[in-house]
UniProtKB/Swiss-Prot annotation:
Organism of this sequence: Shigella flexneri serotype 5b (strain 8401)
Protein name: Ribonuclease T
Residues the entry annotates as binding Mg(2+) 1: D23
Enzyme Commission identifier(s): 3.1.13.-
Record-annotated site: Important for substrate binding and specificity: F29, F77, F124, F146
Any GO CC annotation of this UniProt entry: cytosol
Limits of the Exonuclease domain: 20-194
């Protein structure tokens, strides 16, 4: 492992993983059959002192894939009209291709080896993104096929809250419930929450590891 003084890089902090915050809005709960309707991604960076912060934001409204299910209950919940021409929706391929292109550049620039998804209740977002990547025959998917950083679990440990809005408020962050269930807003809040948890652990002395505990 590097000397403590050198542990200010993303690649050192997360064992070579490049964290990317993701949130999706969908037309149901089944990643194989229900439409992906919106996706946002935020890459992260560290400053020279090793503090984590948001970096680049990408956001796309997505066209339902051919034959996709559109559950009325899900659409009522997130307020998305898939047929609204003003959404400016793009294909799954276009959205994921652009996200992955930026992510691959970030991996290279940071000296990391692979991207890892950060999301709130991450299994849901991960399953939809991976299913969409498979449908789009996306080449060179930079994301780990199953590992994630789940901010619901991390916030439960660090803050005693698992609901995104309550975790943000407990951490001293603003949360506007009227903007919730927008992929862009939820990704922004999740990114700031993840950074706060990581940085709080650093402020408390948990990172870098004390001498003798490095591996």
């Amino acid at each position: 492992m590097s000397d403590n003084a050198q542990l200010t890089g993303l690649c050192d902090r997360f064992r070579g993983f490049y964290p990317v915050v993701i949130d999706v809005e969908t037309a149901g709960f089944n990643a194989k059959t229900d439409a992906l309707l919106e996706i946002a991604a935020i890459t992260l960076k560290m400053d020279e002192q090793g503090w984590l912060m948001p970096d680049t934001t990408l956001h796309f409204h997505v066209e339902p894939f051919v034959g996709a299910n559109l559950q009325p209950e899900a659409l009522a919940f997130n307020g998305i009209d898939p047929n609204d021409p003003d959404r400016g929706a793009v294909s799954e391929y276009e959205a994921l291709h652009e996200i992955c292109k930026v992510v691959r550049k970030g991996i290279k620039a940071s000296g990391c080896n692979r991207a890892i998804m950060v999301a709130h209740n991450a299994n849901f977002d991960h399953s939809f993104m991976m299913a969409a990547a498979e449908r789009a025959s996306l080449k060179r998917n930079p994301f780990h096929p199953f590992a994630t950083f789940d901010t619901a679990a991390l916030a439960g440990l660090a803050l005693g809250q698992t609901v995104l809005s309550k975790a943000c408020q407990t951490a001293g962050m603003d949360f506007d419930s009227t903007q919730a269930h927008s992929a862009l807003y939820d990704t922004e809040r999740t990114a700031v929450l993840f950074c706060e948890i990581v940085n709080r652990w650093k402020r408390l002395g948990g990172w870098p590891l004390p001498a003798g505990e490095e591996v």
